[in-house]
């Protein structure tokens, strides 16, 4: 075969092969096999989702693709040729860019400087500001953004930061762009803009890898889905008409969707927490409801319904402006979180990273931070033995996945951080647990574990009041669903009869119509 013909054949073969291929990728750390023989392919002009529980190996694979990690075994092929990335520069030069959840930008620098960071245009040994602005405007225009390139990044929104990160990738002519949980901090409008840009990048023939726990995003965007479990490849769905929530969950966790909530009936006791015409800051109307011992009550509503504000008021984070609280039939006054904790009322907040954990402290410290006030020695010294034993007990009983009690909690997954917060309150004399978006940002498998913990608390007679914007979660978990709209209760549904249609109808009613029964709640 002649040399020109061989070259032509090689070019044709490359054109017909997948743009990106993972061939037997493995990655080991001391004592841990993070990835085991991962093989799948991605096509140009395709949005390819990666799904799996936390710890399934998605992020590790992206770090190998970006040059942050070197695989223990296997190869990555781009356009039919094996590549070997020993650092991130190698990957960038090969046209690979990763848009991480924690954006890698410099707030004090301008938009233009961030876009061309590491490759600023120069003229006579100086940064060519005119060319920098010109080139930056081209990249921003490509994304449909009207932003002054000279604006310091710190003055932009998180959504705009993300667009700058994408512009930075395009400035390096990235043909493979991976997004790792990109919508976690975005508003609905910013998410819509991001999706528009991602679809445009697909139309340009780029390979898009997309990692998210949010199934609605996966189904809205993806052309194919590859599922990982415990560091291993499970399967690829390349026909989106043949996949649904149930089949995807089954592939991810090995359980049917109905098993995730695993509703557990139990004995409901007497009234534990009673709200009589209670108003809180951000809650427009007086709220009256009761949660019994061993009962799980879910608060559902659309954005602005007042669910989080009510829970914050009950915990003393914000002020209750009127009404009465009863705990086990006795009047209760709550002016601060200390009052609530002393009464046995605990809160797992909506934003666990900002309000629930102390990121730079250990798992042990985060579990013991509340109980510490009761366990100090006579000399006001920390009782290290008790704290170590208590932390180990909570880690084992809640199956918190951590290398050890001294691991920084910021290094744990969202599900394990949430379990550590629950472990903190198990050290208290808990009567009521308030949970605000208890499984937001948590993978399906960890959700199942959180639900089991909630059921166990309820079986111990603890009253559970939780707020969630995940309607299937509310319907699957709660004994009763209290629906709120614009700071008022618009209806109430019983677990046995509640449907998504009823709950959404109540959430969108224009006039509050308090209903106390089952299917008759919505006329």
From Swiss-Prot:
List the SMART domains: AAA (SM00382)
Localization, UniProt: Cell inner membrane
Q: Does the keyword Ribonucleoprotein apply?
A: no
Domain (ABC transporter) ranges = 20-255, 268-511
Q: Does ATP-binding show up as a keyword for this record?
A: yes
Q: Which UniProt keywords apply?
A: ATP-binding, Cell inner membrane, Cell membrane, Membrane, Nucleotide-binding, Repeat, Sugar transport, Translocase, Transport
Task: Name the source's superkingdom.
Answer: Bacteria
Its record classes its membrane topology as: Peripheral membrane protein
| InterPro entries in UniProt | AAA+_ATPase, ABC_carbohydrate_import_ATPase, ABC_transporter-like_ATP-bd, ABC_transporter-like_CS, P-loop_NTPase
> Which Pfam family is one of those matched by this entry?
ABC_tran
Per its UniProt record, what CDD domains does this chain match? ABC_Carb_Monos_I, ABC_Carb_Monos_II
Task: Give the EC number(s) under which this enzyme is classified.
Answer: 7.5.2.12
Q: Which residues bind ATP?
A: 52-59
Alphabetically, the GO molecular function entries are: ABC-type L-arabinose transporter activity; ATP binding; ATP hydrolysis activity
Q: Which GO terms describe its cellular component?
A: plasma membrane
Q: Which reactions fall under this protein's catalytic activity?
A: L-arabinose(out) + ATP + H2O = L-arabinose(in) + ADP + phosphate + H(+)
Protein family: Belongs to the ABC transporter superfamily. Arabinose importer (TC 3.A.1.2.2) family.
Record note on quaternary structure? The complex is composed of two ATP-binding proteins (AraG), two transmembrane proteins (AraH) and a solute-binding protein (AraF).
Explain the purpose of this protein. Answer: Part of the ABC transporter complex AraFGH involved in arabinose import. Responsible for energy coupling to the transport system.
Q: What is this protein called?
A: Arabinose import ATP-binding protein AraG
Which source organism does the UniProt entry give?
Yersinia pestis
């Amino acid at each position: 075969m002649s040399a020109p013909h061989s070259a032509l054949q090689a070019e044709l073969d490359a054109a017909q092969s997948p743009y990106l291929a993972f061939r037997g990728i493995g990655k080991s750390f001391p004592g841990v096999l993070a990835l085991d023989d991962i093989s799948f392919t991605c096509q140009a002009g395709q949005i390819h989702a990666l799904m799996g529980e936390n710890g399934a190996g998605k992020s590790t694979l992206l770090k190998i693709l970006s040059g942050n990690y070197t695989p223990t075994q296997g190869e990555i092929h781009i356009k039919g040729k094996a590549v070997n990335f020993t650092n991130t520069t190698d990957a960038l030069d090969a046209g690979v860019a990763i848009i991480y959840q924690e954006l890698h930008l410099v707030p004090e620098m301008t938009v233009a400087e961030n876009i061309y960071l590491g490759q600023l245009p120069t003229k006579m040994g100086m940064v060519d500001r005119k060319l920098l602005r010109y080139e930056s405007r081209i990249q921003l225009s490509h994304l449909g953004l009207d932003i002054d390139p000279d604006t310091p990044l710190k003055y932009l929104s998180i959504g705009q930061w993300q667009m700058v990160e994408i512009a930075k990738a395009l400035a390096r002519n990235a043909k493979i762009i991976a997004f790792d949980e990109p919508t976690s901090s975005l508003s609905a409008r910013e998410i819509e803009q991001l999706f528009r840009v991602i679809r445009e990048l697909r139309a340009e023939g780029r390979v898009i890898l997309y990692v998210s726990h949010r199934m609605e995003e996966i189904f809205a965007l993806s052309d194919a889905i590859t599922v990982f479990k415990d560091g291993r490849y499970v399967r690829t769905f390349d026909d989106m008409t043949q996949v649904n929530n149930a089949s995807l969950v089954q592939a991810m966790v090995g359980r049917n969707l109905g098993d995730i909530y695993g509703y557990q009936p139990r004995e409901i006791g007497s009234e534990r927490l009673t709200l009589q015409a209670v108003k809180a800051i951000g809650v427009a109307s007086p709220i009256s409801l009761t949660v019994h011992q061993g009962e799980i009550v879910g608060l559902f509503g659309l954005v602005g319904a007042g669910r989080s504000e009510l829970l914050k008021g009950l915990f003393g984070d914000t002020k209750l402006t009127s009404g009465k609280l009863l705990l086990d039939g006795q009047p209760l006054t709550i002016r601060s979180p200390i009052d609530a904790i002393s009464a046995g009322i605990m809160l797992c907040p909506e934003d666990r990273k900002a309000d629930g954990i102390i990121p730079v402290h250990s798992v042990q410290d985060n579990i013991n931070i509340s109980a510490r006030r009761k366990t100090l020695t006579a000399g006001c010294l920390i009782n290290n033995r008790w704290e170590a034993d208590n932390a180990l007990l909570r880690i084992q009983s809640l199956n918190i996945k951590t290398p050890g009690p001294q691991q920084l909690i910021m290094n744990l997954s969202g599900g394990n951080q949430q379990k550590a917060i629950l472990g903190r309150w198990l050290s208290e004399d808990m009567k009521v647990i308030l949970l605000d978006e208890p499984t937001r940002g948590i993978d399906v498998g960890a959700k199942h574990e959180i639900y089991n913990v909630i059921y166990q608390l309820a079986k111990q007679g603890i009253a559970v009041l939780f707020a969630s914007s995940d309607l299937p979660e509310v319907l699957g978990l709660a004994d009763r669903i209290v629906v709120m709209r614009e700071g008022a209760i618009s209806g109430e549904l019983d677990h046995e009869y509640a449907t998504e249609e009823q709950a959404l109808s109540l959430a969108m009613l224009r006039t509050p119509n308090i209903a106390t029964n089952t299917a008759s709640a919505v006329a």
